[in-house]
Regions:
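Structural motif
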Residues: 5-6, 37-38, 110-112, 195, ...
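Active-site environment of divalent metal-dependent phosphoester hydrolases
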Residues: 15-17, 47-50, 76-89, 119-123, ...
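Active-site-proximal loop/helix segment associated with metal-binding centers of metalloenzymes
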Residues: 117-181
Length: 240
């Protein structure tokens, strides 16, 4: 279904324990249908979320809010490195289109392709190897088989370790540059979209990398409600 104005949000990392972020995101969800006629959740919405069997109760208000938005405007989720594991039934069961890796949309006459951007943004070789391991179907299957009393502490410990760098400006700059280089190569191909959405680096960006070809990164929602709007024009925004 073609859209006129797509609201893009990513990297809220809900469940990480930051004060007020869940309430801010719920306020964003209430506002979202008035900001555009479609909503794209570009990964790492949750710090960790691995299917309904391992659903933290703290996420219940957000999941209810997402279902309400999806009943009003087309809503799409593409998984991030923190929340693509396991079943996507939590999303599809609430009327949300969900893809683990990549999604294509038509917005204001433009072809938009969205991915989380973690594959393009990993800086260290050790992190790229770790990312490949924890994103594998085997890791998802092992996690799904674990009792919640073991599974939750395990991923919380891994999350704290793997996410310790995400507020480091040096890491962000390097991740953003890797993404930019990957985006430039992708946008230069014959079947390139007009707009490529990548998140993960937490560096908010709207940049025309070549004539008529744009890179959009909405930034990290947990930093004051950052998001982006893709339509006839492309812009960054913040929840006021």
């Amino acid at each position: 279904m073609p859209l006129d104005r797509l609201v893009v949000v990513a990297d809220a990392h809900l469940g990480r324990g930051r004060d007020g972020i869940t309430d801010l995101f719920l306020r964003f969800l209430r506002a979202a249908p008035g900001l555009g006629d479609g909503l794209l959740l570009a990964g790492d919405l949750f710090e960790f979320r691995f299917g309904d069997a391992h659903e933290p109760a703290a996420h219940a208000p957000v999941l209810a809010g997402l279902a309400e938005v999806a009943a009003r405007v087309p809503t799409t989720f593409v998984g991030g490195n923190h929340d693509r594991w396991g079943s996507l039934g939590w999303a599809t069961g609430r009327g949300i289109r969900a893809e683990a890796e990549s999604v294509a949309l038509e917005v204001a006459g433009r072809r938009v392709v969205a991915e989380h951007g973690d594959r393009q943004g990993q800086v260290r070789l050790s992190r790229r190897v770790a990312h490949a391991l924890v994103s594998s179907p085997l890791a998802s299957a092992v996690y799904a088989a674990l009792p919640a009393a073991i599974a939750f502490p395990l991923v919380e410990r891994w999350s704290a370790r793997s996410g310790a760098h995400r507020d480091d400006p040096v890491w962000r700059a390097r991740a953003a540059e890797r993404q930019r280089a990957a985006a430039r190569a992708r946008l230069g191909t014959a079947d390139a979209p007009e707009v490529l959405v990548l998140a993960h680096s937490h560096v908010a960006t709207v940049e025309e990398l070549m004539p008529g070809r744009w890179l959009v990164n909405p930034g990290a929602f947990y930093e004051g409600g950052r998001h982006a709007v893709v339509g006839r024009d492309l812009r960054l925004a913040q929840l006021s």
